[in-house]
Amino acid sequence: MKPNIHPDNYRTVLFFDSSANEGWLIRSCAGTHGKTMVWTDGKEYLLFSLDTSSSSHPVYTGKQRNVNTEGRASKFNQRFQSVMSSFRKDK
């Protein structure tokens, strides 16, 4: 292996998914902007915040929603049917 090709800031980082309230300690060189968090072992680690991970993403959790676009269109038409009929009478 070539010497001096690896990053100098390779350290243990806490990746924390705030929506699932779950975290993982991983060695990484990801930028953390100096944020820290005390983990369950009582030690303070650099923090990398995640919005979504495999613990919270609907594809991985099985809580996926199917959107019925036909139902949405019919609800829209029902709500504004009276408005459209009065508009047509005026012309």
Curated annotation (Swiss-Prot):
Pfam name, any one: Ribosomal_L31
Subunit structure: Part of the 50S ribosomal subunit.
Organism: Neisseria gonorrhoeae (strain ATCC 700825 / FA 1090)
The keyword Amino-acid biosynthesis belongs to this UniProt entry's keyword annotation: no
GO biological process, one term: translation
GO MF term list: structural constituent of ribosome
Database matches in SUPFAM superfamilies: L28p-like
UniProt record similarity statement: Belongs to the bacterial ribosomal protein bL31 family. Type B subfamily.
Presence of the UniProt keyword Ribosomal protein in the record: yes
Keywords carried by this UniProt record: Ribonucleoprotein, Ribosomal protein
Entry GO CC: ribonucleoprotein complex; ribosome
InterPro entries with a match to the protein in the record: Ribosomal_bL28/bL31-like_sf, Ribosomal_bL31, Ribosomal_bL31_B, Ribosomal_bL31_sf
Name of the featured protein: Large ribosomal subunit protein bL31B
